[in-house]
């Protein structure tokens, strides 16, 4: 089977972590490129010659697409649209991608009338407008698939996404729906809840193992705990929240997951400045540090990271998402047992932050 080119949408900045997961789960996948759609998405292009279904198990991605057409250098003029219409109507690559999508839908018992929807995202300055781009795509589809019906809702059988990023054009057919990015049903969410794909990326960076004693001491709605459960077995799963209300709802969210309830899961009402765990009793920590006034964070960070250094086992690992980079670096300089290995700048809910991997020496 010839390798097919796919692309994954991620939250901006998560694309490097998403590729690490793709490479681990799909050993024969080959990296093609990574792109950045302003502050909307990261994009990872890769080739893979296996069945499509295993792609749906990826966790650090928001959406997955079959690549139908790709141009490295467009003219930014009207010629682009004439060429796009022609290639949609005539090029075998587009037909092959549609056939693969239809086969995948049949295998998954998806059926329905041949409807389609166009999603266009344009970043840069061009002679044509986004609406002109949409009309060019529609013209090509009508020429090739005259029986297809254009619809405006989210229930089209075929979603054609066209991204123009500077001089790069990528046309993809969507394989997934909203359930990939909004995968958890929660009893209650709080405003600071991170997206599941970001939580999954953080969990991947912890290098999950069945012997883990895993802690999220500031678990919010419990998203990191839920993603750790999805990553496989662990010896103990521990969560903490500052208020009894948050602890209660995070506990409900984790326990209502469809997978068998873990006998080793415990939720604590705790303060991140004084963790109720023995020295060197935990080997993995992942958490999203709160944002807020600098004075409050300047009191929290030193005490919290002193506790992380205390409870982590030697060679343990902490994966921390925070927005106060300078404060974190200053505090870690005061903890000689903690070493920052690397970091990834990401954005979530229109706010930039950084995921740090911290090693306990």
Q: Can you describe what each PLM-predicted range is?
A:
Residues 170-207:
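SAM-dependent Rossmann-like transferase core, predominantly class I methyltransferases
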Residues 246, 256-257, 267-350:
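S-adenosylmethionine
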Residues 44, 168-169:
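Hydrophobic residues embedded in beta-strands of well-ordered beta-sheets
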Residues 44-48, 347-361:
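Core SAM-dependent methyltransferase catalytic element
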Residues 194-275, 279, 284, 292:
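Conserved S-adenosyl-L-methionine
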Residues 2-153:
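Non-catalytic nucleic-acid substrate-recognition regions in nucleic-acid-modifying enzymes
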Residues 22, 228, 307-308:
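Class I S-adenosylmethionine-dependent transferase superfamily signal
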